[in-house]
Amino acid sequence: MEGKTTMKGLAMLGIGRIGWIEKKIPECGPLDALVRPLALAPCTSDTHTVWAGAIGDRHDMILGHEAVGQIVKVGSLVKRLKVGDKVIVPAITPDWGEEESQRGYPMHSGGMLGGWKFSNFKDGVFSEVFHVNEADANLALLPRDIKPEDAVMLSDMVTTGFHGAELANIKLGDTVCVIGIGPVGLMSVAGANHLGAGRIFAVGSRKHCCDIALEYGATDIINYKNGDIVEQILKATDGKGVDKVVIAGGDVHTFAQAVKMIKPGSDIGNVNYLGEGDNIDIPRSEWGVGMGHKHIHGGLTPGGRVRMEKLASLISTGKLDTSKLITHRFEGLEKVEDALMLMKNKPADLIKPVVRIHYDDEDTLH
């Protein structure tokens, strides 16, 4: 980066259009850091943003929010980090002094979804260099025993999937249904398992995802191609339904299925990015005409350093293997476009693509 003033990145040019652009390298504030990518992963939400226009039109905004990187510059007030450090970059990078952060909702710092900065209202990570606010609070050092490509799954997939299990308030022995077993849903299965769920139903149809769901702790597979998933769940539970539901896929109509399959006094946790539709369906009768104590919780995953450190410890201790999520591997920043198009086109064997970027001075930068 020495002497350079511009960087290239893969950007959303407008709704339905992407391309490579050149931009000025961001300024590094006193609390901030500039980072170069070591591993990147495109997300389904990137495709919602570009091709569905889910958050409105964006022009020349660099995409991407899942990264592991290496610090190339730190601000004068940064204490914990230095140039050359390899770091896990959470998709959610809150401003920790905001009122929402002080109230316990840092993911909404500055306003609803305000902690989600990358590829929302700030250039993302699919570039030669990217900016991270409040580096000490938001960047976690990459443990030496974790590969960058495995750690990049922590940025969003693991934390979001586990948050679905947290939102569903899963307790020991609960019967749980996870709707949607893409990478986030697979991590919701793993999260439910870690929180002590008993029977775990995983709803999906692609064989590879179903096989991996079983490896992460699912006990039953519900294939929506075999009939109504509510009827299948009720039949499998002798008409009782489930204690908790995690929604990690589907659309605005999926909430109706969740409400129909849970018991009174139960919880639904949603971490699915609803890219389309103005309203969600909640069936009046099955919701107990509004009084069924069937609770719906939807939440953006928490961000920040400490959460990344705790999730990384699950990999370091052998309790979570994120490499099972990675089905396609690329080398070089320019390949992030191919990886993004894979997420858009969703071939049957896809779970998650990862792009690894190498540098000659990766182990000597300081």
Curated annotation (Swiss-Prot):
It comes from Entamoeba histolytica (strain ATCC 30459 / HM-1:IMSS / ABRM). Alcohol dehydrogenase with a preference for medium chain secondary alcohols, such as 2-butanol and isopropanol. Has very low activity with primary alcohols, such as ethanol. Under physiological conditions, the enzyme reduces aldehydes and 2-ketones to produce secondary alcohols. Is also active with acetaldehyde and propionaldehyde. This is NADP-dependent isopropanol dehydrogenase. Binds 1 zinc ion per subunit. Keywords: Cytoplasm, Metal-binding, NADP, Oxidoreductase, Zinc. It comes from the Eukaryota. The lineage of its organism: Eukaryota, Amoebozoa, Evosea, Archamoebae, Mastigamoebida. PROSITE patterns: ADH_ZINC. Belongs to the zinc-containing alcohol dehydrogenase family. Homodimer. It is found in: Cytoplasm. GO terms for molecular function: isopropanol dehydrogenase (NADP+) activity; zinc ion binding. Its EC number is 1.1.1.80.
